Regions:
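A short alpha-helical cap/connector motif
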Residues: 1-88, 92-174
Length: 174
């Protein structure tokens, strides 16, 4: 497993913990986008990218995609699509992730946050906004799972046990 797909196990766990609700992907990738295209045909996928090199167009009616120049352009469209069961946050530039996580907080049941061990992403200033937080520290870069929903937190715990994935729990305020 290379450094670009260390989020795959946590993402799979999130999809099991929150089934059948639409997924949001911020930052398409060589590994995450094909995985989500395979797993989200029944639930729907909204995927946004700002780099033409990584952008993949829609694969069907169940998938909506946008290539944006600036991340701020996505907000009217992303919010018009409704709420999301899972969001993968793995886009560039680094500090944009914290801005978008804070804005998505009330629209997503479970966040999958890549690169949680690194200060360059600005997570320290916002991670306390989520009551339940875990990190998959079994591979670098780390991937976090963040939620404010008690039922989702319980589902994450059960899915982690079932999958054999060891998660490090952080105490949050929510």
């Amino acid at each position: 497993m290379g450094k670009y797909n260390t989020h795959a196990l946590a993402l799979e766990l999130a999809l099991r913990a929150v089934p059948m609700l639409r997924v949001l992907e911020l930052g398409q990738g060589r590994y995450s986008t094909p995985l989500l295209m395979q797993r989200c045909q029944e639930r729907g996928l909204v995927s946004v990218e700002n780099n033409p090199k990584y952008y993949r167009p829609s694969a069907g009616a169940w998938m909506q995609t946008r290539l944006v120049r600036e991340w701020e352009e996505m907000w009217p469209w992303v919010l018009a699509c409704g709420s999301y069961g899972v969001a993968l946050v793995d886009h560039a530039p680094a500090l944009r992730r914290a801005v978008d996580l804070a804005r998505l907080r009330d629209h997503v049941w479970l966040m999958v946050v890549h690169d949680t061990e690194s200060a360059e992403y600005g997570y320290a200033g916002i991670r306390e906004q989520w009551r339940w937080r875990w990190d998959d520290r079994g591979r670098r870069p780390w991937t976090g799972l963040w939620t404010n929903r008690e039922g989702v937190a319980a589902a994450v715990g059960l899915a982690a046990i079932a999958s054999g994935l060891t998660l490090t729990r952080e105490q949050g305020q929510g």
